From Swiss-Prot:
PROSITE patterns: DAO
Record organism: Bos taurus
Protein name per UniProt: D-aspartate oxidase
Misc: The enzyme is inactive in complex with 6-hydroxy-flavin adenine dinucleotide (6-OH-FAD); the complex is not physiologically relevant but an artifact of purification procedures.
Chain positions found as Blocked amino end (Met): M1
EC number, as in UniProt: 1.4.3.1
Cellular component terms per the entry's GO annotation: cytoplasm; cytosol; peroxisomal matrix
Amino acid sequence: MDTVRIAVVGAGVMGLSTAVCISKMVPGCSITVISDKFTPETTSDVAAGMLIPPTYPDTPIQKQKQWFKETFDHLFAIVNSAEAEDAGVILVSGWQIFQSIPTEEVPYWADVVLGFRKMTKDELKKFPQHVFGHAFTTLKCEGPAYLPWLQKRVKGNGGLILTRRIEDLWELHPSFDIVVNCSGLGSRQLAGDSKIFPVRGQVLKVQAPWVKHFIRDSSGLTYIYPGISNVTLGGTRQKGDWNLSPDAEISKEILSRCCALEPSLRGAYDLREKVGLRPTRPGVRLEKELLAQDSRRLPVVHHYGHGSGGIAMHWGTALEATRLVNECVQVLRTPAPKSKL
Protein backbone atom coordinates (compact mmCIF):
# COMPACT_ATOMS: atom_id res chain seq x y z
CA MET A 1 0.00 0.00 0.00
CA ASP A 2 1.33 3.46 -0.90
CA THR A 3 0.25 6.50 1.09
CA VAL A 4 -2.17 5.67 3.91
CA ARG A 5 -4.99 8.25 3.90
CA ILE A 6 -6.01 9.30 7.39
CA ALA A 7 -9.04 11.45 8.28
CA VAL A 8 -9.12 13.15 11.68
CA VAL A 9 -12.69 14.15 12.58
CA GLY A 10 -12.79 17.16 14.92
CA ALA A 11 -10.67 20.31 15.11
CA GLY A 12 -10.56 21.03 18.82
CA VAL A 13 -7.38 20.47 20.80
CA MET A 14 -7.72 16.65 20.47
CA GLY A 15 -8.13 16.56 16.70
CA LEU A 16 -5.38 19.07 15.92
CA SER A 17 -2.83 17.70 18.40
CA THR A 18 -3.43 14.14 17.16
CA ALA A 19 -3.01 15.29 13.55
CA VAL A 20 0.33 16.95 14.46
CA CYS A 21 1.55 13.84 16.32
CA ILE A 22 0.60 11.52 13.42
CA SER A 23 2.35 13.79 10.91
CA LYS A 24 5.53 13.65 13.01
CA MET A 25 5.49 10.00 14.03
CA VAL A 26 3.77 7.92 11.32
CA PRO A 27 5.62 8.12 7.99
CA GLY A 28 3.93 7.64 4.61
CA CYS A 29 0.54 9.09 5.55
CA SER A 30 -1.63 11.88 4.24
CA ILE A 31 -3.68 13.64 6.91
CA THR A 32 -6.96 15.54 6.50
CA VAL A 33 -8.62 17.25 9.47
CA ILE A 34 -12.37 17.43 8.89
CA SER A 35 -14.77 19.45 11.05
CA ASP A 36 -17.78 21.73 10.81
CA LYS A 37 -16.33 23.89 13.63
CA PHE A 38 -12.87 25.41 13.86
CA THR A 39 -11.26 27.92 16.22
CA PRO A 40 -12.65 30.24 17.63
CA GLU A 41 -15.86 28.15 17.76
CA THR A 42 -14.69 25.03 19.63
CA THR A 43 -14.97 24.05 23.30
CA SER A 44 -11.16 24.32 23.49
CA ASP A 45 -11.47 28.06 22.72
CA VAL A 46 -13.56 28.64 25.86
CA ALA A 47 -11.38 26.48 28.14
CA ALA A 48 -9.21 28.31 30.65
CA GLY A 49 -6.42 25.92 29.66
CA MET A 50 -4.84 25.51 33.10
CA LEU A 51 -2.61 22.49 33.57
CA ILE A 52 -4.29 21.24 36.74
CA PRO A 53 -5.61 17.80 35.81
CA PRO A 54 -8.85 16.16 36.92
CA THR A 55 -8.92 12.57 38.18
CA TYR A 56 -10.63 9.99 35.95
CA PRO A 57 -12.08 7.32 38.28
CA ASP A 58 -11.88 4.50 35.68
CA THR A 59 -8.27 5.12 34.62
CA PRO A 60 -5.14 3.89 36.46
CA ILE A 61 -3.38 6.80 38.20
CA GLN A 62 -0.03 5.93 36.54
CA LYS A 63 -1.66 6.28 33.12
CA GLN A 64 -3.19 9.66 34.07
CA LYS A 65 0.16 10.84 35.39
CA GLN A 66 1.87 9.80 32.15
CA TRP A 67 -0.67 11.72 30.04
CA PHE A 68 -0.29 14.81 32.22
CA LYS A 69 3.52 14.67 32.34
CA GLU A 70 3.82 14.26 28.56
CA THR A 71 1.49 17.24 28.08
CA PHE A 72 3.36 19.34 30.67
CA ASP A 73 6.75 18.51 29.09
CA HIS A 74 5.48 19.36 25.59
CA LEU A 75 4.08 22.75 26.69
CA PHE A 76 7.08 23.48 28.95
CA ALA A 77 9.34 23.11 25.90
CA ILE A 78 7.11 25.62 24.06
CA VAL A 79 7.12 28.11 26.97
CA ASN A 80 10.94 28.00 26.94
CA SER A 81 11.08 28.75 23.21
CA ALA A 82 10.50 31.72 20.92
CA GLU A 83 7.11 30.14 20.04
CA ALA A 84 5.57 30.78 23.48
CA GLU A 85 3.68 33.95 22.60
CA ASP A 86 2.44 32.66 19.25
CA ALA A 87 1.26 29.38 20.84
CA GLY A 88 -0.38 31.13 23.81
CA VAL A 89 1.53 29.22 26.50
CA ILE A 90 2.62 30.88 29.77
CA LEU A 91 3.82 29.93 33.24
CA VAL A 92 1.55 31.01 36.08
CA SER A 93 1.91 30.66 39.86
CA GLY A 94 -0.79 30.57 42.49
CA TRP A 95 -2.81 28.66 45.03
CA GLN A 96 -5.32 25.84 45.25
CA ILE A 97 -7.26 26.26 48.50
CA PHE A 98 -9.40 23.93 50.65
CA GLN A 99 -12.14 24.55 53.23
CA SER A 100 -11.25 21.27 54.96
CA ILE A 101 -8.06 19.22 54.94
CA PRO A 102 -8.23 16.81 51.96
CA THR A 103 -7.77 13.05 52.44
CA GLU A 104 -5.06 13.23 49.79
CA GLU A 105 -2.83 16.11 50.84
CA VAL A 106 -0.45 15.58 47.92
CA PRO A 107 -2.14 14.94 44.52
CA TYR A 108 -0.67 12.50 41.97
CA TRP A 109 0.54 15.36 39.77
CA ALA A 110 2.45 17.23 42.52
CA ASP A 111 5.91 16.31 41.19
CA VAL A 112 5.01 17.23 37.58
CA VAL A 113 4.13 20.90 38.20
CA LEU A 114 6.90 23.21 39.44
CA GLY A 115 7.72 24.01 43.08
CA PHE A 116 4.72 22.24 44.61
CA ARG A 117 4.38 22.77 48.38
CA LYS A 118 1.78 23.18 51.10
CA MET A 119 0.76 26.78 51.78
CA THR A 120 2.13 28.49 54.87
CA LYS A 121 -0.06 29.90 57.67
CA ASP A 122 0.80 33.41 56.50
CA GLU A 123 -0.30 32.66 52.93
CA LEU A 124 -3.57 31.19 54.19
CA LYS A 125 -4.36 34.50 55.97
CA LYS A 126 -5.37 35.78 52.54
CA PHE A 127 -8.19 33.19 52.54
CA PRO A 128 -9.85 33.20 56.00
CA GLN A 129 -12.55 30.69 54.94
CA HIS A 130 -9.93 28.10 53.95
CA VAL A 131 -7.73 25.94 56.19
CA PHE A 132 -5.32 24.24 53.79
CA GLY A 133 -3.78 24.86 50.39
CA HIS A 134 -1.22 24.03 47.73
CA ALA A 135 1.14 26.58 46.18
CA PHE A 136 2.75 25.78 42.82
CA THR A 137 3.64 27.02 39.36
CA THR A 138 1.99 25.45 36.34
CA LEU A 139 1.32 26.18 32.68
CA LYS A 140 -1.64 27.86 31.02
CA CYS A 141 -2.35 27.06 27.39
CA GLU A 142 -4.83 29.40 25.70
CA GLY A 143 -7.03 27.81 23.03
CA PRO A 144 -7.59 30.94 20.88
CA ALA A 145 -3.81 31.10 20.24
CA TYR A 146 -2.84 27.43 20.61
CA LEU A 147 -5.41 26.01 18.15
CA PRO A 148 -4.30 28.25 15.22
CA TRP A 149 -0.68 27.41 16.15
CA LEU A 150 -1.48 23.67 15.92
CA GLN A 151 -3.44 24.24 12.69
CA LYS A 152 -0.39 25.95 11.18
CA ARG A 153 1.71 22.92 12.12
CA VAL A 154 -0.76 20.49 10.54
CA LYS A 155 -0.59 22.46 7.28
CA GLY A 156 3.19 22.90 7.52
CA ASN A 157 3.56 19.12 7.75
CA GLY A 158 1.50 18.69 4.57
CA GLY A 159 -1.92 18.10 6.16
CA LEU A 160 -5.20 19.39 4.75
CA ILE A 161 -8.00 21.17 6.62
CA LEU A 162 -11.54 20.58 5.38
CA THR A 163 -14.74 22.27 6.60
CA ARG A 164 -17.49 19.69 6.41
CA ARG A 165 -20.11 18.22 8.72
CA ILE A 166 -19.86 14.44 9.04
CA GLU A 167 -23.11 12.64 9.91
CA ASP A 168 -21.72 9.08 9.70
CA LEU A 169 -18.11 7.82 9.75
CA TRP A 170 -18.91 5.59 6.75
CA GLU A 171 -19.11 8.77 4.62
CA LEU A 172 -15.30 8.76 4.81
CA HIS A 173 -15.04 5.32 3.17
CA PRO A 174 -13.48 4.63 0.63
CA SER A 175 -11.78 8.07 0.41
CA PHE A 176 -9.84 7.34 3.62
CA ASP A 177 -8.14 4.21 4.94
CA ILE A 178 -8.21 5.10 8.67
CA VAL A 179 -10.45 7.47 10.64
CA VAL A 180 -9.46 9.12 13.94
CA ASN A 181 -12.58 10.17 15.82
CA CYS A 182 -11.87 13.29 17.92
CA SER A 183 -15.44 14.61 17.69
CA GLY A 184 -16.06 14.99 21.44
CA LEU A 185 -19.81 15.25 22.07
CA GLY A 186 -20.33 14.46 18.37
CA SER A 187 -19.47 10.86 19.30
CA ARG A 188 -22.99 10.39 20.64
CA GLN A 189 -24.05 10.33 17.00
CA LEU A 190 -20.86 9.31 15.17
CA ALA A 191 -19.86 6.47 17.49
CA GLY A 192 -23.25 5.71 19.07
CA ASP A 193 -21.70 6.43 22.48
CA SER A 194 -24.46 6.88 25.04
CA LYS A 195 -21.89 7.27 27.86
CA ILE A 196 -20.80 10.75 26.75
CA PHE A 197 -22.70 13.80 27.99
CA PRO A 198 -22.12 17.56 28.24
CA VAL A 199 -21.06 19.32 31.42
CA ARG A 200 -21.82 22.97 30.80
CA GLY A 201 -19.20 25.49 31.84
CA GLN A 202 -19.89 29.22 31.96
CA VAL A 203 -17.01 31.64 32.55
CA LEU A 204 -16.30 35.35 32.50
CA LYS A 205 -13.30 36.77 30.66
CA VAL A 206 -12.46 40.09 32.32
CA GLN A 207 -9.81 42.79 32.33
CA ALA A 208 -8.03 42.87 35.71
CA PRO A 209 -4.34 43.26 34.82
CA TRP A 210 -3.33 43.65 38.48
CA VAL A 211 -4.31 40.01 39.20
CA LYS A 212 -1.14 37.96 38.69
CA HIS A 213 -1.69 34.78 40.76
CA PHE A 214 -4.21 32.05 40.03
CA ILE A 215 -6.62 31.05 42.79
CA ARG A 216 -8.60 27.83 42.59
CA ASP A 217 -11.06 26.52 45.15
CA SER A 218 -10.53 22.77 45.62
CA SER A 219 -14.09 22.06 44.42
CA GLY A 220 -12.91 23.28 41.02
CA LEU A 221 -16.09 25.37 40.81
CA THR A 222 -14.61 28.76 41.71
CA TYR A 223 -11.41 29.87 40.04
CA ILE A 224 -9.46 32.94 38.97
CA TYR A 225 -6.95 32.28 36.19
CA PRO A 226 -4.90 35.24 34.89
CA GLY A 227 -3.91 34.83 31.25
CA ILE A 228 -2.15 36.69 28.47
CA SER A 229 -4.86 39.22 27.60
CA ASN A 230 -7.57 38.66 30.22
CA VAL A 231 -8.47 36.87 33.45
CA THR A 232 -10.84 33.88 33.37
CA LEU A 233 -13.35 33.72 36.22
CA GLY A 234 -15.36 30.58 36.78
CA GLY A 235 -17.33 28.65 36.82
CA THR A 236 -20.10 26.08 36.58
CA ARG A 237 -20.49 22.32 36.13
CA GLN A 238 -24.00 21.68 34.85
CA LYS A 239 -24.37 18.02 33.87
CA GLY A 240 -26.54 17.23 30.86
CA ASP A 241 -27.10 20.93 30.04
CA TRP A 242 -26.68 21.68 26.30
CA ASN A 243 -27.46 25.41 26.53
CA LEU A 244 -24.72 27.53 24.91
CA SER A 245 -26.34 30.88 25.78
CA PRO A 246 -24.85 32.72 28.78
CA ASP A 247 -27.08 33.07 31.85
CA ALA A 248 -26.84 36.56 33.41
CA GLU A 249 -27.75 35.30 36.91
CA ILE A 250 -24.95 32.72 36.79
CA SER A 251 -22.48 35.41 35.68
CA LYS A 252 -23.43 37.54 38.70
CA GLU A 253 -22.97 34.55 40.99
CA ILE A 254 -19.55 33.68 39.48
CA LEU A 255 -18.36 37.26 39.95
CA SER A 256 -19.58 37.30 43.55
CA ARG A 257 -17.81 33.97 44.36
CA CYS A 258 -14.56 35.17 42.76
CA CYS A 259 -14.70 38.54 44.55
CA ALA A 260 -15.03 36.68 47.86
CA LEU A 261 -11.59 35.14 47.15
CA GLU A 262 -10.04 38.20 45.45
CA PRO A 263 -11.90 41.40 46.48
CA SER A 264 -9.91 43.54 44.01
CA LEU A 265 -11.93 41.92 41.20
CA ARG A 266 -14.72 44.39 42.09
CA GLY A 267 -12.71 46.71 39.84
CA ALA A 268 -12.61 44.29 36.88
CA TYR A 269 -13.89 45.73 33.61
CA ASP A 270 -14.83 44.67 30.06
CA LEU A 271 -16.64 41.52 31.26
CA ARG A 272 -17.39 38.96 28.54
CA GLU A 273 -19.42 35.80 29.06
CA LYS A 274 -18.41 32.49 27.45
CA VAL A 275 -20.00 29.05 27.52
CA GLY A 276 -18.49 25.67 26.62
CA LEU A 277 -19.77 22.10 26.85
CA ARG A 278 -17.19 19.70 28.27
CA PRO A 279 -17.39 16.25 26.58
CA THR A 280 -17.62 14.03 29.65
CA ARG A 281 -17.76 10.26 30.21
CA PRO A 282 -16.52 7.93 32.98
CA GLY A 283 -13.07 7.86 31.31
CA VAL A 284 -11.33 9.03 28.16
CA ARG A 285 -12.14 6.78 25.20
CA LEU A 286 -8.85 5.82 23.60
CA GLU A 287 -9.14 2.63 21.57
CA LYS A 288 -9.27 1.02 18.14
CA GLU A 289 -12.47 -0.24 16.54
CA LEU A 290 -12.86 -2.03 13.20
CA LEU A 291 -16.17 -0.99 11.63
CA ALA A 292 -17.58 -3.61 9.26
CA GLN A 293 -20.41 -3.27 6.74
CA ASP A 294 -20.87 -6.19 4.32
CA SER A 295 -17.38 -6.73 2.90
CA ARG A 296 -16.21 -3.21 3.75
CA ARG A 297 -13.86 -2.49 6.64
CA LEU A 298 -13.01 0.86 8.22
CA PRO A 299 -10.42 1.04 11.04
CA VAL A 300 -11.28 3.78 13.55
CA VAL A 301 -9.22 5.15 16.45
CA HIS A 302 -11.40 6.87 19.07
CA HIS A 303 -9.86 9.74 21.05
CA TYR A 304 -12.39 11.78 23.05
CA GLY A 305 -14.19 12.26 26.36
CA HIS A 306 -11.66 14.23 28.44
CA GLY A 307 -14.25 16.29 30.33
CA SER A 308 -12.58 19.21 32.12
CA GLY A 309 -9.09 17.79 31.48
CA GLY A 310 -8.84 18.30 27.73
CA ILE A 311 -5.97 20.76 27.58
CA ALA A 312 -4.26 19.32 30.69
CA MET A 313 -4.06 15.83 29.11
CA HIS A 314 -4.20 16.46 25.34
CA TRP A 315 -0.61 15.77 24.24
CA GLY A 316 -0.23 12.60 26.31
CA THR A 317 -3.45 11.13 24.94
CA ALA A 318 -2.64 12.33 21.39
CA LEU A 319 0.65 10.39 21.59
CA GLU A 320 -1.28 7.29 22.69
CA ALA A 321 -3.86 7.75 19.90
CA THR A 322 -0.96 8.06 17.43
CA ARG A 323 0.47 4.73 18.62
CA LEU A 324 -2.93 3.14 17.92
CA VAL A 325 -3.02 4.76 14.45
CA ASN A 326 0.45 3.36 13.78
CA GLU A 327 -0.80 -0.14 14.67
CA CYS A 328 -3.66 0.27 12.16
CA VAL A 329 -1.18 1.45 9.49
CA GLN A 330 1.04 -1.60 10.08
CA VAL A 331 -1.96 -3.93 9.62
CA LEU A 332 -2.90 -2.21 6.34
CA ARG A 333 0.68 -2.52 5.11
CA THR A 334 0.93 -6.23 5.94
CA PRO A 335 0.10 -8.20 2.78
CA ALA A 336 -2.85 -10.60 3.17
CA PRO A 337 -1.74 -14.24 3.05
CA LYS A 338 -2.49 -15.88 -0.30
CA SER A 339 -5.00 -18.70 0.01
CA LYS A 340 -3.70 -22.12 -0.97
CA LEU A 341 -6.15 -23.83 -3.29
